[in-house]
Design a protein with these regions (language model features):
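Canonical positions in the second alpha-helix
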Residues: 55, 99-100, 133-135, 209
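Bacterial N-terminal signal peptides
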Residues: 6-16
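Cleaved targeting-peptide boundary
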Residues: 20-28
C-alpha cells in the first residue's frame, strides 16, 4: 500500500513535467507510465514493470521512470519467501534502486529501499557495507550521514548484547530482597571476541555520529549502551580497573544523553 501511494504521488508530480514534453518518444513514455500506474493499481506488478521499462527505453532522460521501474520490481518481492526466484527479484529491485542513486545520490527512498531489501534477504554484510558507504559519503548532509553511523552502532550494540545477556553469561544472585548481576566469560572464546569486536566497533560508529551531529539523541543513547556492553565484557575478562573506567564513561555518556534529550524537548 505504501509503494502504491508513493507511485501515485510520483505520477501526480510528474504530470506537469510530462505534459510539457513535445517529442513523440516522450509522449509515448508518458502513456507507458500511465499504463504502468494502472497495472500497479490492479496488482499486475509484472505488467507494471514492463510498461515502466518501456517508458525508460523511450525516454532515457525521464526523471520518474527509473523509480517506476524500481518500485514495480520491489512490489513483486514477497517478504519472508526465501525461494531463489524471490531472492532474485529482491536483487533485481536493489539494482534498479542503485541505478537511481547513480543519478541522484541523495535519494532517500532508493537508499532506504536497498537497505530494507538487503536486511529482508539476510545479506547482513552487504547491508553493513551499504550503510557504511552512506555514512562515509561526504556529498550527503551530516544529519543523514550521522543517521547511517547510528544504524551501524545499533547493529553492533545488538551483536554484543545478544551475547552478554545469554543466561549462561549473565548470572543473577538474590540475597534477601536484593539481587545482583554479574557476568562470566563464555565457554567459547570466539563468542567473547565477537562481542568485544562488535562493541568496540559500535563505540567508534556512535562517536562518528556524534562528531557529525553533537545533538543526536539516538547516537548518544547508543554510545551509552555500548559503553555498558564494554563494561560487561571487561568484567568477563576480569579487568576490574578497566571496568571501573568504562562505568565512569558510561555515567558521563548517560548524563550527556539526558541533557541532549532535555534540550530537544519543545519548550512550553
Amino acid at each position: 500500500m505504501k509503494l502504491l501511494t508513493s507511485l501515485i504521488i510520483t505520477i501526480a508530480l510528474a504530470a506537469p513535467l510530462l505534459a510539457q514534453t513535445p517529442t513523440v518518444a516522450e509522449a509515448q513514455a508518458k502513456q507507458e507510465l500511465n499504463e504502468a500506474a494502472r497495472a500497479y493499481r490492479e496488482g499486475k506488478f509484472a505488467d507494471a514493470q514492463a510498461h515502466s521499462e518501456r517508458a525508460l527505453q523511450l525516454d532515457p532522460q525521464n526523471k520518474t521512470a527509473p523509480m517506476f521501474v524500481a518500485r514495480t520490481i520491489h512490489a513483486q518481492y514477497k517478504p519472508g519467501d526465501f525461494t531463489p526466484e524471490n531472492i532474485a527479484k529482491a536483487r533485481e529491485a536493489i539494482i534498479a534502486y542503485q541505478a537511481i542513486l547513480s543519478r541522484s545520490p541523495a535519494d532517500d527512498e532508493a537508499y532506504k529501499a536497498v537497505a530494507y531489501l538487503y536486511g529482508a534477504i539476510k545479506e547482513d554484510e552487504l547491508l553493513r557495507e551499504w550503510v557504511f558507504q552512506r555514512a562515509g559519503n561526504v556529498s550527503i548532509d551530516n544529519a543523514k550521514r550521522a543517521e547511517a553511523y547510528t544504524v551501524l552502532a545499533s547493529r553492533d550494540w545488538d551483536c554484543s548484547f545478544k551475547i552478554t545477556e545469554l543466561p549462561a553469561h549473565k548470572v543473577t544472585t538474590v540475597k534477601g530482597d536484593k539481587a545482583s548481576v554479574s557476568y562470566r566469560m563464555p565457554k567459547a572464546q570466539a563468542e567473547f571476541e565477537r562481542a568485544k569486536e562488535c562493541a568496540n566497533r559500535g563505540l567508534e560508529m556512535a562517536n562518528m555520529a556524534i562528531a557529525l551531529t553533537p545533538e543526536a539523541e539516538s547516537a548518544w543513547a547508543y554510545k551509552t549502551n555500548i559503553l555498558l556492553e564494554l563494561a560487561k565484557l571487561a568484567e568477563m575478562s576480569g579487568d576490574v580497573q578497566y571496568k571501573h573506567e568504562l562505568q565512569r564513561q558510561y555515567e558521563e555518556a548517560l548524563n550527556e544523553t539526558t541533557k541532549v534529550a532535555n534540550r530537544s524537548k519543545p519548550k512550553p
